């Protein structure tokens, strides 16, 4: 084999190895961006539109619920949507931030059961698998009256 051919092949191989991390990072970023969009669309369909048919198409055959006050599985989610539709038809969550880390997406939300209420600061965490929402965690904190706050910062 000729030395020039060997050097050329070695350089091409080195270039491929050097480009691989950038390609993988770009691919991972694209997956995370898609996962964010899935979580946002899911949140809006389930909690803002309260549309079970649309929501059902966005979840997997299993839906693991980590909120201990909510029923596990797709039927539990359906019951929660029906409850919101009946008891809190004006319930609305404004997504303030969306962050993705691999298959996990966190949404920082200002949720109000009705427009005249201060509402809650919520962080919803969703796990996305094969383009479907399959798992959910949340943390909810009531927004205090301004005069009871210990600082002037907002929760959002």
PLM regions: where:
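Short beta-strand edge/turn micro-motifs at domain boundaries
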Residues: 123-151
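Bacterial N-terminal signal peptides
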Residues: 8-18
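Short, solvent-exposed coil/turn segments at beta-strand boundaries
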Residues: 55, 59, 100-104, 126-134
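Short, surface-exposed coil-to-beta transition loops
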Residues: 91-93, 117-123
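Bacterial N-terminal signal peptides that target proteins for export
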Residues: 1-9
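Short beta-strand segments that buttress and anchor functional surface loops
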Residues: 107-114
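Short, low-complexity N-terminal intrinsically disordered segments enriched in polar/charged residues
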Residues: 19-53, 57, 150-156
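A solvent-exposed, acidic/Ser-Thr-rich amphipathic alpha-helical stretch
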Residues: 52-101
């Amino acid at each position: 084999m000729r030395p020039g051919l060997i050097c050329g092949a070695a350089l091409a191989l080195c270039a491929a190895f050097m480009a691989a991390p950038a390609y993988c990072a770009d691919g991972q970023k694209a997956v995370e961006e898609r996962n964010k969009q899935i979580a946002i669309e899911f949140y809006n369909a389930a909690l803002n539109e309260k549309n079970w048919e649309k929501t059902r198409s966005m979840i997997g055959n299993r839906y693991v619920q980590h909120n201990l006050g909510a029923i596990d599985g797709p039927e539990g989610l359906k019951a929660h949507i029906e409850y919101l539709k009946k008891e809190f038809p004006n319930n609305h969550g404004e997504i303030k931030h969306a962050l993705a880390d691999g298959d996990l997406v966190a949404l920082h939300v200002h949720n109000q059961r009705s427009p005249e209420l201060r509402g809650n600061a919520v962080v919803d965490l969703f796990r996305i698998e094969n383009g479907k929402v399959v798992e959910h965690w949340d943390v909810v904190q009531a927004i205090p009256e301004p005069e009871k706050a210990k600082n002037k910062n907002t929760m959002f």
